[in-house]
Amino acid sequence: MEKFLDINEIKKIIPHRYPFLLVDKITELEEGKSAVGYKNVTANEYFFNGHFPEEPVMPGVLIIEALAQVGAVAILSKEEFKGKIAYFGGINKAKFRKKVVPGDVLKLSIDLTKIKGVAGVGKAVATVDGKVAAEAELLFVVGK
């Protein structure tokens, strides 16, 4: 079942807030299975002040975090995980393939490939204009 979530609905599912909420909207959500979200990267992002002042580039770790937040929406939408928090359990096979700069629209896609109990794995891909900017296998654990 596809769902659209605006920023207020996202904030009801995950606990992240400014300046660390890195997802603006969710355009596709299959609870417990997959999600697609977007981050509009603007020149006003706090991290561009120091990364890098003369050539602003979104830090790769924040792209991974944005992917994880979309993954958290997917897993925490499952009835048994509502109201809980998804924590990183690990990051495997992370690759950064394209710079993300002010003006880019970051498409954040995750497919949850395995869930066992409160732990799981997701295949995550971030793209800009259809080109892969980053990808990784994300491991997570759901806690209180």
Swiss-Prot record:
Signal peptide location: none
One MF term in the entry's GO annotations: (3R)-hydroxyacyl-[acyl-carrier-protein] dehydratase activity
Catalytic residues as annotated in Swiss-Prot or TrEMBL: H51
Gene3D superfamilies tied to this protein: Hotdog Thioesterase
Catalyzed reactions: a (3R)-hydroxyacyl-[ACP] = a (2E)-enoyl-[ACP] + H2O
Gene Ontology biological process terms in this record: fatty acid biosynthetic process; lipid A biosynthetic process
EC numbers for this chain: 4.2.1.59
Domain of life, source organism: Bacteria
Annotated compartments: Cytoplasm
Major place of residence: cytoplasm
Alphabetized UniProt keyword annotations: Cytoplasm, Lipid A biosynthesis, Lipid biosynthesis, Lipid metabolism, Lyase
Top enzyme category: lyase
UniProt keyword annotation of Cytoplasm present: yes
GO cellular component, one term: cytoplasm
Function: Involved in unsaturated fatty acids biosynthesis. Catalyzes the dehydration of short chain beta-hydroxyacyl-ACPs and long chain saturated and unsaturated beta-hydroxyacyl-ACPs.
Family label: Belongs to the thioester dehydratase family. FabZ subfamily.
Protein name: 3-hydroxyacyl-[acyl-carrier-protein] dehydratase FabZ
Organism for this UniProt entry: Clostridium botulinum (strain Langeland / NCTC 10281 / Type F)
